[in-house]
From Swiss-Prot:
The active site is at E103. HAMAP family: Rib_5P_isom_A. Catalyzes the reversible conversion of ribose-5-phosphate to ribulose 5-phosphate. SUPFAM superfamilies: D-ribose-5-phosphate isomerase (RpiA), lid domain (SSF75445), NagB/RpiA/CoA transferase-like (SSF100950). This is Ribose-5-phosphate isomerase A.
């Protein structure tokens, strides 16, 4: 299978976790787009979706899937999203698509996080993929200085404004051996909206696409 075929395979496999007449949390990115396309085939069997980005909302609505505001939902069963990296502890780096804050919020409300990814995203130690940090524009340079103190090399992602009207710093050069601790430390820096570490709330199930098919990993 090609990488695109692996993404389609895990998107299709995630449908097995969708229960009838429920609300589905939907992430953002190319792999999630494959899930959204697959979800359209059973759209009459679900209540609605909660979306983590304007891009996913547009795709869902274009396929005739109702999107509801997270503020109108108390909880829902599953949140389906991709990852830029995922380690054996089911901790992830996310935010390559700049939707990390809304993704983290929607994931927090879901009972279960279903991560869908191709095998190239599996790593033993996270950090080769630059760690995204969403920041208030006023604080960008201050946050960058603090991130350098942690051993990282933050690079401003020029030309990108998040759905929250904030900016992204991509932190290169980290070897993340304690993701839970680093997530807390970075989130405490004034001016940080959130860091793209999903460790405090990691994945419960990972559907990993490879040339041999889809492998299911559970926490």
């Amino acid at each position: 299978m090609t990488q695109d075929e692996m993404k389609k395979a895990v998107g299709q496999a995630a449908l097995a976790y969708v229960q009838p007449n429920t609300i589905i949390g939907v992430g953002t990115g190319s792999t999630v787009n494959c899930f959204i396309d697959a979800l359209a085939s059973i759209k009459d069997q679900i209540k609605a979706a909660v979306s983590s980005s304007e891009a996913s909302t547009a795709r869902l609505q274009a396929l005739g899937i109702t999107v509801v505001d997270l503020n109108d939902v108390t909880e829902f069963d599953i949140y389906v999203d991709g990852a830029d990296e995922i380690n054996p502890h089911m901790e992830m780096i996310k935010g390559g698509g700049a939707a990390l804050t809304r993704e983290k919020i929607v994931a927090a409300v879901a009972k279960r996080f279903i991560c869908i990814a191709d095998a190239t995203k599996q790593v033993e130690v996270m950090g080769k993929f630059p760690l995204p940090v969403e920041v208030i524009p006023l604080a960008r340079e201050y946050v960058a200085r603090e991130l350098r103190k942690l051993g990282g090399n933050p690079v401003y992602r020029e030309g990108v404004i998040t759905d929250n009207q904030c900016q992204i710093l991509d932190v290169h050069g980290l070897q993340i051996t304690n993701a839970k601790a680093l997530e807390l430390v970075i989130n405490q820096i004034p001016g940080v909206v959130t860091v793209g570490l999903f460790a405090q709330r990691g994945a419960d199930v990972a559907l990993i696409g490879s040339p041999d098919g889809v492998t299911t990993i559970t926490k």
